[in-house]
């Protein structure tokens, strides 16, 4: 049956998890990667080794499968008393529950909570039997191999899944970009700019393999833009400068401008560019907030970070150029030609156009300097292309959906039989799905 049912695609991020089935255009569920458990006095259990001591699957569903030391053998009512996602956030607002985020900076930190989260995702939300489905999970670049082994132990021993494939998020984001009209060939070589809520990563990928030594992270992402909008509202003394209002303004009105000085002049000449945003406060009272310069100033912190903070001063285009220049020389042309955007903080209007222009200027300046030093030898130039597409927000999930529906996907998965024969270390390596020898 597992050969006929669609694969389950799960992209668990620091902020949000995306769950769904291969072949679909969008995830079935998107909710916070959060879990609410009973306070310690209520006895939530857990093991010091990091392996969970929780029950999730009724014995009549296990068919006797699975060792006695895992979920199916530890059915206590206290182990089932928890919530995930939006329900967890709501439960934590009441008495008796504590809110936890099992993933920090892309890495799973609490395996007990993560197993409970996966269990509810599978049985309560997706409502599938793991024995009948192959699973495609995502991981951040440079994820420790021990994390893969822990994941395999949970999915094979606790959930008894039919097959497991773990893919790097950046590689899946490249696959998601294949839907763009700009992409002529389905290449897994490119530079992925993944900007979510907490951090922005610049990740070079060559033939489906991450160039780990060249990865750079910058401490500017969606949350910083929200804080910046909030500070601008407070400075003006707006009647509502809450974080929620700042986020609404960021998502609804902000865009990237080609030149910040000229944009200020445009606003000063044309007052119609200033907008009004109406908020209904908890008591039912409506207030109006003026929306002005922050429309273009907020996303500008990617390109001129000094307007936000003195802690980090390197513009994103300079970081991207440096990442590619630090990569092996034989793949640099492909990395410049296929710069792929991923994550919610890359969705601003004209973000890709501005990034492409600024990187191109850096490249052209370097080429001209090289031509001068060489005594007049002319360069053939370098193609710089930033790829924007409709699947940017959930790029890794959609890439997993694309690759998970291919006929050969199941042959690339590791199975329960292989896991039992070779042990957890088998998941340290996966054949490259969609790359050389793949689709």
UniProtKB/Swiss-Prot annotation:
<dbReference type="GO" id="GO:0051285">
    <property type="term" value="C:cell cortex of cell tip"/>
</dbReference>
<dbReference type="Pfam" id="PF00022">
    <property type="entry name" value="Actin"/>
</dbReference>
<protein>
    <recommendedName>
        <fullName>Actin-related protein 3</fullName>
    </recommendedName>
</protein>
<comment type="subunit">
    <text>Component of the Arp2/3 complex composed.</text>
</comment>
<feature type="region of interest" description="Disordered">
    <location>
        <begin position="40"/>
        <end position="71"/>
    </location>
</feature>
<dbReference type="GO" id="GO:0030479">
    <property type="term" value="C:actin cortical patch"/>
</dbReference>
<dbReference type="GO" id="GO:0034314">
    <property type="term" value="P:Arp2/3 complex-mediated actin nucleation"/>
</dbReference>
<keyword id="KW-0067">ATP-binding</keyword>
<dbReference type="InterPro" id="IPR043129">
    <property type="entry name" value="ATPase_NBD"/>
</dbReference>
<dbReference type="GO" id="GO:0051015">
    <property type="term" value="F:actin filament binding"/>
</dbReference>
<dbReference type="GO" id="GO:0030041">
    <property type="term" value="P:actin filament polymerization"/>
</dbReference>
<comment type="function">
    <text>Functions as ATP-binding component of the Arp2/3 complex which is involved in regulation of actin polymerization and together with an activating nucleation-promoting factor (NPF) mediates the formation of branched actin networks. Seems to contact the pointed end of the daughter actin filament.</text>
</comment>
<keyword id="KW-0206">Cytoskeleton</keyword>
<dbReference type="GO" id="GO:0032153">
    <property type="term" value="C:cell division site"/>
</dbReference>
<keyword id="KW-0009">Actin-binding</keyword>
<keyword id="KW-0547">Nucleotide-binding</keyword>
<dbReference type="GO" id="GO:0005885">
    <property type="term" value="C:Arp2/3 protein complex"/>
</dbReference>
<keyword id="KW-0963">Cytoplasm</keyword>
<dbReference type="InterPro" id="IPR004000">
    <property type="entry name" value="Actin"/>
</dbReference>
<comment type="similarity">
    <text>Belongs to the actin family. ARP3 subfamily.</text>
</comment>
<dbReference type="GO" id="GO:0044396">
    <property type="term" value="P:actin cortical patch organization"/>
</dbReference>
<dbReference type="GO" id="GO:0005524">
    <property type="term" value="F:ATP binding"/>
</dbReference>
<dbReference type="InterPro" id="IPR020902">
    <property type="entry name" value="Actin/actin-like_CS"/>
</dbReference>
